[in-house]
């Protein structure tokens, strides 16, 4: 019998089905544990932390899912696009492609998203092909980002690995804006190469000014225990930058982070 589905935006009644879908695809190994809490999924939608789209079978079962959500970047208007998955029985259909196209057509415009980003895993080509086909640009390679156990249930033996999984960092802008970008001269060639795919008339200037003496560094550490990843986000650099960075790197080591970003 041919499998069919309906694409729709998230409803509260989908929350239990989304949790069940995560368990079918990832078991209990997904590193962000809030995905296993139906009440948290509903709360995130209500307050705009996460917007989701789903594919439902004719019987109303959630058979596919994708999300736009706030993650580690400090900009509350920059949403990560990810968590695309379908039930095993639907993997030989185009449900995932249809769901991603539907979500991109509906959610960013509905909620005024100006830019989104994602992490396309490197243990298969599927997500890389989808992001490329949908106008994303690759801006970085995150080496050994995800633990192997996150994928032992999600993929077959060919895509599963005993090693950590790297990802491509990708961005898509819906409202490109020219910016003045300051960069260390030593990285000029590399950064111009990276920005070439997302250039919106940016102006590039060498970062030659000294650290501001009367200002403290504003930076924070986010640790994702399940993935053994620590991310240091710097919003403003002050005279104490070197000491503050060393402190946060030490805290990341104490948290047993395998990957530090």
Residue spans of the language-model regions?
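Conserved acetyl-CoA-binding loop of GNAT-fold acetyltransferases
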Residues: 132-141
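C-terminal "cap" of GNAT-fold acetyltransferases
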Residues: 146-185
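Conserved beta-strand-loop-alpha-helix junction that forms the acyl-donor binding cleft
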Residues: 117-127, 137, 145-146, 259-261
């Amino acid at each position: 019998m041919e499998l069919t589905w309906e694409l729709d935006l998230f409803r509260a009644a989908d929350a239990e089905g989304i949790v069940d879908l995560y368990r079918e695809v990832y078991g209990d190994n997904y590193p962000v544990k809030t995905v296993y809490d139906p009440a948290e999924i509903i709360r995130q939608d209500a307050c705009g932390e996460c917007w989701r789209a789903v594919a439902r079978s004719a019987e109303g079962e959630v058979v596919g899912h994708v999300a736009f959500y706030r993650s580690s970047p400090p900009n509350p208007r920059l949403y990560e696009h990810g968590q695309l998955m379908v039930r095993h029985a639907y993997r030989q259909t185009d449900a995932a492609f249809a769901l991603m196209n539907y979500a991109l057509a509906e959610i960013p415009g509905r909620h005024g998203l100006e830019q989104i980003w994602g992490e396309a895993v490197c243990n298969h080509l599927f997500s890389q092909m989808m992001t490329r086909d949908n106008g994303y640009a690759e801006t970085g390679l995150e080496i050994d980002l995800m633990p192997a156990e996150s994928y032992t249930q999600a993929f077959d033996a060919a895509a599963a690995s005993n090693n950590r999984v790297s990802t491509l960092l990708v961005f898509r802008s819906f409202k490109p804006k020219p910016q003045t970008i300051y960069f260390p001269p030593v990285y000029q060639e590399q950064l111009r190469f990276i920005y070439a795919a997302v250039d919106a008339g940016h102006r590039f200037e060498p970062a030659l000014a000294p650290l501001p003496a009367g200002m403290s560094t504003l930076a924070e550490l986010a640790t994702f225990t399940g993935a053994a990843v620590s991310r240091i986000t710097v919003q403003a650099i002050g005279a104490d930058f070197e000491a503050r960075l060393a402190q946060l790197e030490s805290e990341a080591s104490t948290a047993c982070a395998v990957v530090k970003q």
